[in-house]
Amino acid sequence: MSEEDIRAARLEKVEQLKQLGTNPYAYRWESTHHAAQLQEKFADLTSGEEVDTEVAIAGRIMARRVFGKLAFFTLEDETGTIQLYLEKNRIQESMAETDADAFNHLKQLTDVGDILGAKGTIKRTEKGELSIYVKEYTILTKSLLPLPDKWHGLTDVAKRYRQRYVDLIVNPEVRQTFRRRAQITAGIRRYLEQRDFLEIETPVLQSETGGADARPFITYHNTLEMELYLRIATELHLKRLIVGGFEKVFELGRVFRNEGISTRHNPEFTSIEIYQAYADYNDMMALTEGIITTVAQDVLGTLQITYQGETVDLTPPWRRVTMHDLVKEYTGLDFHSFQTLEEAKSASKNAGIPGVDEAQTIGKILNLAFEEKVEANLIQPTFVIDYPVEISPLAKPHRSQPGLVERFELFIVGRETANSFSELTDPIDQRERLEAQAAKKAAGDLEAQGVDEDFLTALEYGMPPTGGLGIGIDRLVMLLTDSASIRDVIAFPLLKPEGSFIKEYRYESTTQTLTMEFDSGSVYEYFKVPLTVKEELDNAPSKGQYFHKFIKGKFKYEQLS
C-alpha cells in the first residue's frame, strides 16, 4: 500500500473508534512504571512464572503479532521496550462494561505506531520474554502515517535530520545521543556552579557585533528603526560583567554565524564562555581539563574513549606546546628565524603551504602552516599555546614573547574544542586593535570586528586581570558520543529547503512569462513578469535570494509539474 492509502485506511479507523465512543486522542494516562524499571525489577522472574503485581504503562506499538485469540505487541517508551501479552478471554472479561468486543477492536483498529496505554500483571512467557499480561488497554493516540520499515528504515541522512521526530522514534541510539547531550550540559553547569561561577544571560540581539571574527546575521527593529545583529559571541557582554564587579561568570547558550554548513559547522550552535577575574590562560587550561574530564567520567564512566576509530585518552595532564614548536615539528619551519615577510612566504611555499601569497604578516603565515600541516594530527588532547597577535585581537600580549599573545586552543581528534585568552585589559591597546579590525571591515572583510565604543568605555573604568575560556558544546558532544557530524548532535539542524534551489529558468518577453525549474523537479510559470525583473535576476549574486524576495508571492503563477 502507498503511504496515501495507509493514511486513508487509518483515518477510517479513527472514525470507527469515534463511533464506538472512544476518543482516539486521549487527554492523559497515568503510568506506574517505565519499561526499563519493569525489566530491572523482574529480571529474576523465571520462564512461565507470574506475579500479581498490578502495573500500568504507556508507549508506542513497535511490533504486532496477532493470532486468533492471542496477540503480542512490543511496546516502547522512553526507557526501552516490553512485550504486551494480550489474551482474548482476559481482556473481554476485564473490559466487558466499556467495550464488549474489546479484543477484536484491538486487533482491527490498532497499528504499529499507535500510542497505547495498558494495565495488567507481570509474567514471563515460556519462551522467556518478560511481559505485561494485559487486562485493559486504551488507545491514547492513533497514528496516521506508517513508520519506516524496520530493515530498510530511515536511511536517507538528510531525511533523518529533516524529520528528526521519526528518526527518534525508530533509532533509540539517537535518543541516547540527546540524553547524553543534556547530561553533558548539566554536568558543565554543575561543575562551574560548585566553584562559585554565576551564569548570567546576555543579549542575543546586539547593536554591535564583536567577540569573534565571523559574519553576523542581520535583522531590523521596526520600532527603533535600527539594524540589529544576532550575537556571534557572548564575550564582550560577559567582560562588561567582570568590569562591573562579578569575578566568575559564564553563559551557556546559542550563538549565530552567517557562514557555511559542514560536518563541523552549523550557523546556529551552542557554546559556553567563561570569565574569571584575577586568572590567566594557565588557570583556564586547568579549568578546561577539569570540566571535560569530570563530565566525561560522569557521563561515560571512563576517560578512555573511542572517536570514529581513534582511541583518545582524556587523562590529565594534557600536552601543552607552542604553535611555533608544533609547526617546526611537523614542517621543519622555524618561524622565529624569519626576519622578513618575503622570507617566511618563500620558505612556506617550498614546504607546500597554500594561500601564503595573500597573507600580510608572518603571524598569518604561521597560522596557515599550523592549519594545513599540524591541526589534523592532534588526536590526543593538546593545548596549543602562544598565538601570533595578528589573529588574536582580544588577547593580552605575551608577558615574555614579543609578537605573541597569551592564548591557547584545545585540539582533540584534530578538531578545535576550546579557545582561551589571558584577556586584554588595556583599553588603549584594545582600541588600537579594534580600529585595525574596523579598517579591514571597511575594506570588505565581512568577518572582521567593528569598534564597540561602549565596550571600550567599560574597559576604561578598569577590568581586573581576567582569564577567558570558550568551549564548543556541539563539538564536545560529538566527541563524547562518537558522532561524525555536528548535525548528529543538534536536534534540529539547519538544512537547505527541499526543492528551493533554482536549477534553470527561461523568460518569454512577448508574454512576460518566467518559467522556473527547481532542484526538486518542480516547474512553475510566473505571469506578467517585467523584463527588468528578469534582468535583475540575471545579475543577482544570489538568484535564490532574489527569487524569494522579489518574485515568490509577487506574481500569479501556475505549477506545471
Curated annotation (Swiss-Prot):
Sorted UniProt keywords: Aminoacyl-tRNA synthetase, ATP-binding, Cytoplasm, Ligase, Magnesium, Metal-binding, Nucleotide-binding, Protein biosynthesis
Q: Which cofactor does it need?
A: Mg(2+)
Q: What is its EC number?
A: 6.1.1.6
Asked if the keyword Magnesium belongs to this entry, the reply reads yes
Q: Can you provide one Gene Ontology molecular function annotated for this UniProt record?
A: magnesium ion binding
Q: Which residues bind Mg(2+) 2?
A: 416
| Enzyme class name | ligase
The lineage's top-level taxon is Bacteria
GO CC annotation, single: cytosol
What SUPFAM superfamilies does this protein map onto?
Class II aaRS and biotin synthetases, Nucleic acid-binding proteins
Gene Ontology biological process terms in this record: lysyl-tRNA aminoacylation
Protein residues bound to Mg(2+) 1: 409, 416
Q: Do the record's keywords include Nucleotide-binding?
A: yes
**Major place of residence:** cytoplasm
Q: Cofactor binding mode, per the note?
A: Binds 3 Mg(2+) ions per subunit.
Listed under catalytic activity are: tRNA(Lys) + L-lysine + ATP = L-lysyl-tRNA(Lys) + AMP + diphosphate
Q: Where does the record place it?
A: Cytoplasm
Q: Which family does it belong to?
A: Belongs to the class-II aminoacyl-tRNA synthetase family.
Per UniProt, subunit arrangement is: Homodimer.
Its recorded name reads Lysine--tRNA ligase
Record the organism: Trichormus variabilis (strain ATCC 29413 / PCC 7937)
Question: Could you tell me the gene encoding this protein?
Answer: lysS
